[in-house]
Amino acid sequence: MRLKIKAIWVPTVPDIEYLKKLALRGAVNKTVKVSSSEFHKHTGDSSKTAARKLKQMEEERLIERKIVPGGQLIKMTEKGIEILKNEYIEYSRIFSSEPDVLELEGNVLKGLGEGQYYINIPGYRNQFEEKLNFVPFPGTLNVQLSESSSALRNRLKEMPAVRIDGFNDGERTFGGGNCYPIKVEGIEAAVVVPDRTHYPADLIEIIAPVKLRDALKLKDGDRIVTRVKKQGMEGQK
């Protein structure tokens, strides 16, 4: 009996270089036209090797590709973009002057009012008070992260977290999540990351004992920079 073994492609440095070159040409957000005979000049490989690697990247679903007269139309997939985001995270660690600091910046965004509802539920509110040592204002400050900070968001998992357990109030079940203690302009606060959420990955919710919008005179669209440290976090407008 013969066994068919399919090779699994693992990105190498040259392969990541291809993704980077495509991204620099705009293939992250749009479809770009690429000619193997021209593209290979930017990679150092032969045109034959460039054509083979682009085909391989399509097979691994790192790019979407369509052959057209004079070249091919290419757009990066979420999988390909994620590889570059991970590269970005690693480089940020290498060149950060404070390796234990995570800086997230974004713009204040109008919320949907859900934060007020959940914070007022005793099963959550009591845990916030007990574990975070403050009674949160009934509402959250929503911040939409910039593209670069969105790529770094996964590093929150490396920071010390306060676990908020899920519970059942007799009528329905409420899920758990993690809180990351922070300071925003000297105000005790926390980033709330539910286990399950319908919010996009580039949105973070911050709770505090005061209404941060009023305390920091924030309005929709204002830029806020938050520095997350392994022993806490500080933020600034």
Swiss-Prot record:
Q: Which residues bind CDP?
A: G111, L112, G113, E114, G115, Q116, V210, K211, L212, R213
Q: Which reaction does it catalyse?
A: riboflavin + CTP = CDP + FMN + H(+)
Protein's GO biological process: FMN biosynthetic process; riboflavin biosynthetic process
> What cofactor does its activity depend on?
Mg(2+)
Q: Which residues does Mg(2+) bind?
A: T140, N142
User: Which residues lie within the region annotated Riboflavin kinase?
Assistant: 102-237
Please indicate if the UniProt record lists Transport as a keyword.
Answer: no
Asked if the keyword Transmembrane belongs to this entry, the reply reads no
Q: Give EC number(s), comma-separated.
A: 2.7.1.161
The cofactor note reads: Binds 1 Mg(2+) ion per subunit.
Q: What does this protein do?
A: Catalyzes the CTP-dependent phosphorylation of riboflavin (vitamin B2) to form flavin mononucleotide (FMN).
Name of the protein described by the UniProt record: Riboflavin kinase
Encoding gene (name): ribK
